[in-house]
Amino acid sequence: MSLMYFMTPDQEINSIVIVGGGTAGWLTAGIIAAEHCANGTAINDLVEMQITLVESPDVRTIGVGEGTWPSMKSTLQKMGISETDLIRECDASFKQGTLFNDWKTGENDAYTHPFTPPHAYASTNLAPQWQKFRNEVAFADAVSSQNALMFQDLAPKQISTPEYAFNANYGYHLDAGKFAELLRKHCVDKLGITHLKANVIAINSSADGDIESLQTDTKGHITGDLFVDCSGSKALLLGEHFEIPFCSKSQFLFNDTALASQVPYTNSDDPIASSTLSTAQTSGWIWDIGLPTRRGIGHVYSSAHTTEDRASEELLAYIKTTVSPEAALSTSIRKVAFNPGHRAKFWHKNCVAVGMSAGFIEPLEASALVLVELSAAMIAEQLPANRQIMDLVAKRFNAKFLYRWDRIIDFLKLHYVLSQRQDSDYWKDNSAASSIPESLSELVDLWRWQSPWHRDTGHIDEMFPSASFQYVLYGMGFETQSSTTVRRSDREADSAAAGLFRENAERTQKLLTLMPTNRELIDKITTYGLQKI
């Protein structure tokens, strides 16, 4: 009988080496360092973690996105970063969700996916009661006060609201390059992370196959106990060195190319959108992200369904219509091709991949940065004490993130499956049964007869909780049939629903009266700052 718990611990994990900078590398470094006291200050004579980030001076980081989820608030707060500094230094604004245009029919339809759950969602599922008057009011209007804020470009808080506190939940829109620089400076100056500029030219292995050290062109050999691959789509460690297979998901998610641009506002006081705007096109969709000084606008599309020239024409037509003809004429476009999918596993031996090294799909629901947050948080929380138990931690990590990727793919594909558009092969192919994961097909069948709620998302830390599925389903016009069986819980919900709908309407009117515009709040924060909690 093997009782490994009584064995003498072998090599302790005291040194972490992160390969790659950018948002993924520095966010990972900061999250781990904030938890493991990597600032040279040991606690009770315990050894502090040594964290080194190796970044190539020759590689331009793509930036995993300009939109975050609300989880970023607590992530930055734990790292000790001031929200005022974030707004001032990263050209950041507040994001309250996503506004989807032309996804349902392509005929000027619109709906939102707010970050705030439906009113009283913890105890009451209002979706069945809303179904009874679904033709009178949009689902998000009936159950969420945030929907109105998003359509009117209002802020989720006031200048008197402290840092990271809110009246309506929010994430951020930000400049990815400036955000990475803020993280780098904070990690080096405040969290004690060693930053080395060098190219990795060789990877040296130990007898058991672990990575022993990295050979660089200017900094010699760099040793470590755990290596984190944040080298982007190159996947230098997990992909090139360990040859972990890549699992393409292009059979489900067709988009594989993005055309990105940065567009200035016509006027300095133009409204800053409170949501990411996602406008469906013939073979993809256009994102539109409002920062204080510019808009980030891009077109993500399927190269199997359209050409780069046609996609570029649609992007420029959008800019011409929503910004100005002059902006369309002067816009510079950058092309980014990607293979939608992820590695077969993410943690192998003493190497774990985070960010694009682990995988990448279209930025439809801003999943890239939140995956970095969740990956780094799990590494920090379950960092193995020694090499002996690392494989157990790796097994748990891989299972968790394979599940997460499956759920992300289901959620993103749902947007396409529910569309009524049939104006191109792209939309027709997206509704074909062969392009829909079986797990999603089963859920859609289930939801025809019962509304999503807590038990439909089985993990407490789901990326997309059941509330998110409700917003997309009912925003896209999906109908859940009423049960013919009388239930006690239904009668109780019926009696409570009228009051809850009324409470939401009253709260909506109150927030519309109190909340400043996004731009008004950003300007005040830039001038005066927010209160620290």
Q: Which residues are covered by each model-predicted region?
A:
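Low-complexity, highly charged intrinsically disordered N-terminal segments
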Residues: 110-182, 186-190, 230, 242-245, ...
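A conserved active-site cap/scaffold subdomain adjacent to cofactor or substrate pockets
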Residues: 330-335, 344-396
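Predominantly flavin-linked oxidoreductase catalytic cores and closely associated redox partners
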Residues: 162-284, 289-298, 302-311, 376
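Dinucleotide-binding Rossmann-like beta1-alpha1 core, especially the glycine-rich loop
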Residues: 60-151
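N-terminal Rossmann-like FAD-binding beta1-loop-alpha1 element of flavoenzymes
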Residues: 14-46
